[in-house]
A protein has these predicted regions:
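C-terminal flanking helix
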Residues: 53-54
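Helix-turn-helix/homeodomain-like alpha-helical modules used for DNA recognition
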Residues: 72-132
């Protein structure tokens, strides 16, 4: 049995990091090595993100609410004016939003065939996604 947070760590977090990395480089002029430092990942990981080789398990670019959260996170990281706690909370907010919108369901089903997407309300129930 896999739980939604496990799927999020394996599939969603790399997508979010890829989106943030691209925004840091495109909008804030960071080089790959600088974006890697800010995101606490390796420069080769950033290279894979920028070439769409890693971080493509779920398509989030067309969701304006998620894109706004990503942009806010990228801005905070680029400016370096926010606490680690707030960065973590923003990551969690992005994940909760993705889960609440039902965007994780098909991935969860791929990890655990016993998940009944049509009946499951775990992620869309606002009380169940209070991880932080």
């Amino acid at each position: 049995m896999s739980v939604p947070c496990e799927v999020a760590v394996k599939c969603v977090l790399p997508v979010v990091r890829a989106m943030v990395a691209k925004e840091l480089m495109a909008n804030y002029g960071l080089r790959q090595v600088d974006a890697a430092h800010v995101l606490c990942v390796s420069q080769p990981a950033i290279s894979l993100y920028s070439r769409n080789i890693r971080g493509k398990a779920i398509h989030l670019e067309n969701d304006q609410q998620i894109q706004d959260l990503i942009s806010s996170l990228a801005k905070s990281l680029a400016e370096g004016n926010t606490s680690r706690r707030n960065i973590v909370l923003t990551y969690c907010e992005i994940c909760r939003t993705i889960r609440a919108k039902g965007l994780l369901c098909r991935l969860h089903k791929a990890f655990d065939p016993l998940v009944e997407i049509e009946k499951c309300e775990l992620c869309v129930d606002s009380k169940s996604v209070r991880c932080v």
